[in-house]
């Protein structure tokens, strides 16, 4: 019998697929589940085995996810339409692990549970094909147009446990939690409070708190003078930010497939780190570096969102980000208060910002030199206007 590896989350779609692909497509199905900050690996493995998975592979990849994927997004202030790419960042890692396992154990195909409406089908299949074009890809929910009602009926018929918390479609990892479906799709309604898990609503948040973050080469390394590995620092900031209602995003997102979708995200650590990192950049980098970096940031975010992590162009993008971020060192203090982040002071040895120059009360900057600068700086604008005026006058004469 043919062998297949299924990216398995433990949810309804992928649980049904274990049995369905065996019965209808003739595959022996093995499963792969990764802990990227979201999964109870033991219970998910037991569920896959009970349904009929031949082998169940599980792996804790939180450290790799943090240092090889999230870290690159921190350097690039990764964001798509205001969302910090939490789901999108996890997909290339999942694709990589699936390909490695398929090559090691001889699986002929890899399957995922994505629908034909969403972004993940693109991200999984682009990533896997980029790493190994010979592997066959299967997406039963999409390719055989499986309806949720049909999946539930099939699950009941085959004694597959249907998750009881299925009101919303949720994707969760260290960098954020995304929620969609149910009342969230109704644009006439606010986000139901039962959709939140990581943070409290702003009106229920406490009196606020001040934190200090230390950055080295563009990455956060300490909270309040205590050093952390990146994955633990993120986990701590998710707790701190969550109790202060930091990181709630409710927006309409333009998917790769051209569909608009209302998406709700909880991303406390991502919002805190991105704010702090961006503020330090403004203090340290000059305007030319910031201009170049803004371009790199935008391209990086587009590539990640669109599933192009393994495109050759990502290497120079990331290399440029790493060069610019080698200067991003220092500490920054932030006040977190009822969903808002406020700058509370910063220290560093290489700040381009110079208070003595910016200060109107000192003489360190020679203001007289500005006149000569303006005389030269105006030339491009003034000469082009004069040339066009002259051309119009000659045309009328």
Curated annotation (Swiss-Prot):
Major localization listed first in the record, in broad terms: cytoplasm
Keyword match Translocase: no
Protein species of origin: Thermoplasma volcanium (strain ATCC 51530 / DSM 4299 / JCM 9571 / NBRC 15438 / GSS1)
Positions annotated to bind ATP: 7-15, 113
Pathway: Amino-acid biosynthesis; L-arginine biosynthesis; L-arginine from L-ornithine and carbamoyl phosphate: step 2/3
Residues involved in L-aspartate binding: 115, 119-120
Any GO CC annotation of this UniProt entry: cytoplasm
EC code: 6.3.4.5
Entry similarity comment: Belongs to the argininosuccinate synthase family. Type 1 subfamily.
Binding site for L-citrulline: 83, 119, 123, 169, 178, 253, 265
Subunit record text: Homotetramer.
Enzyme class, spelled out: ligase
Catalytic activity: L-citrulline + L-aspartate + ATP = 2-(N(omega)-L-arginino)succinate + AMP + diphosphate + H(+)
Protein name: Argininosuccinate synthase
Record gene name: argG
GO molecular function: argininosuccinate synthase activity; ATP binding
Gene3D superfamilies on file: Argininosuccinate synthetase, chain A, domain 2, HUPs
Domain of life: Archaea
């Amino acid at each position: 019998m043919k062998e297949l590896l299924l990216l398995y989350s433990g949810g309804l779609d992928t649980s049904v697929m274990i049995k369905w692909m065996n019965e209808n497509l003739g595959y022996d199905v093995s499963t792969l589940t990764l802990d990227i900050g979201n999964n109870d690996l033991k219970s998910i493995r037991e569920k896959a085995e009970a349904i009929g998975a031949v082998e169940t592979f599980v792996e804790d990849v939180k450290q790799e996810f943090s240092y090889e994927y999230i870290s690159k997004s921190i350097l690039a202030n990764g964001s798509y339409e205001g969302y910090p790419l939490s789901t999108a960042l996890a997909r290339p890692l999942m694709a990589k692990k699936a390909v490695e396992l398929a090559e090691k154990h001889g699986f002929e195909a890899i399957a995922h549970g994505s629908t034909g409406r969403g972004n993940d089908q693109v991200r999984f299949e682009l990533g896997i094909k980029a790493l190994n074009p010979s592997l066959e890809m299967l997406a039963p929910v999409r390719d055989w147009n499986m309806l949720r009602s049909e999946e539930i009926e099939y699950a009941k018929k085959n004694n597959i446990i249907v998750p009881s918390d299925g009101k919303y479609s949720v994707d969760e990892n260290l960098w954020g939690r995304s929620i969609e479906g149910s009342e969230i799709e109704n644009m006439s309604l606010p986000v139901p409070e039962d959709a939140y898990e990581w943070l409290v609503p702003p009106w229920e948040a406490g009196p606020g708190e001040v934190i200090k973050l230390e950055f080295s080469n563009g990455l956060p390394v300490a909270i309040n003078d205590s050093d952390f590995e990146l994955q633990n620092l993120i986990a701590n900031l998710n707790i701190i930010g969550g109790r202060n209602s930091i990181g709630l995003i409710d927006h309409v997102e333009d998917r790769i497939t051209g569909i608009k979708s209302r998406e709700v995200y909880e991303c406390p650590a991502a919002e805190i780190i991105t704010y702090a990192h961006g503020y330090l950049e403004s203090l340290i980098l000059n305007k030319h570096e910031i201009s170049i970096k803004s371009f790199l940031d935008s391209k990086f975010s587009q590539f990640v969102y669109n599933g192009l992590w393994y495109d050759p162009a990502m290497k120079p993008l990331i290399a440029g980000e790493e060069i610019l971020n080698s200067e991003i060192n220092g500490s920054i203090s932030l006040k977190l208060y009822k969903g808002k982040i406020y700058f509370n002071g910063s220290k560093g040895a290489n700040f381009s910002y110079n208070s003595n120059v910016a200060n109107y009360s000192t003489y360190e900057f020679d203001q007289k030199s500005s006149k000569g600068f303006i005389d030269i700086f105006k030339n491009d604008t003034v000469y082009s206007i004069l040339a066009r005026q002259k051309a119009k006058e000659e045309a009328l004469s």
